[in-house]
């Protein structure tokens, strides 16, 4: 699916499709547009499976889950579906919905077909000269 530090694969993905489960998940992020998705994928990190860099004890679980999640989003986009990273959720609600020890929600990805009348928010992207340097 995606690379991870030392191939630990510290992730779990939960597809949320039933109306009952979607209603509970929507309590974690109460935005009107979010409620219109036909399904969600909850991206979880298994804190017990994360690789930790020995030099400074930096755990790489968030990075690994982010890489796998973006692979998922790119695959959905390739199939004509719309996705959006949602990280501004209520962590207390997510812990209640996913109480497994060592699991922590990293992102919620709503997935669906983009409405034809959906406004496109063109964003200014930094130019290469702003983000790239050479030494």
PLM region spans:
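Glycine/small-residue-rich phosphate/adenosyl-binding loop
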Residues: 5-68
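Short secondary-structure boundary segments
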Residues: 45, 88, 113
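Small-aliphatic-rich amphipathic alpha-helix that forms the alpha element of a beta-alpha
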Residues: 41, 56-97
């Amino acid at each position: 699916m995606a690379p991870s530090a030392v191939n630990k694969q510290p992730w779990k993905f939960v597809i949320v499709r039933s109306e009952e489960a979607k209603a509970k998940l929507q309590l974690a992020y109460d935005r009107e547009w979010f409620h219109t998705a036909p399904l969600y994928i909850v991206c979880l990190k298994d804190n017990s499976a994360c690789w930790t860099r020995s030099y400074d004890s930096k755990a790489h679980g968030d990075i690994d889950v982010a890489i796998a999640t973006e692979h998922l989003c790119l695959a959905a986009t390739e199939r004509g579906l719309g996705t959006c990273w949602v990280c501004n959720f209520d962590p207390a609600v997510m812990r209640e919905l996913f109480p497994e020890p060592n699991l922590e929600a990293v992102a919620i990805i709503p997935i669906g077909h983009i409405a034809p009348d959906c406004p496109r928010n063109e964003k200014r992207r930094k130019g290469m000269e702003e983000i790239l340097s050479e030494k």
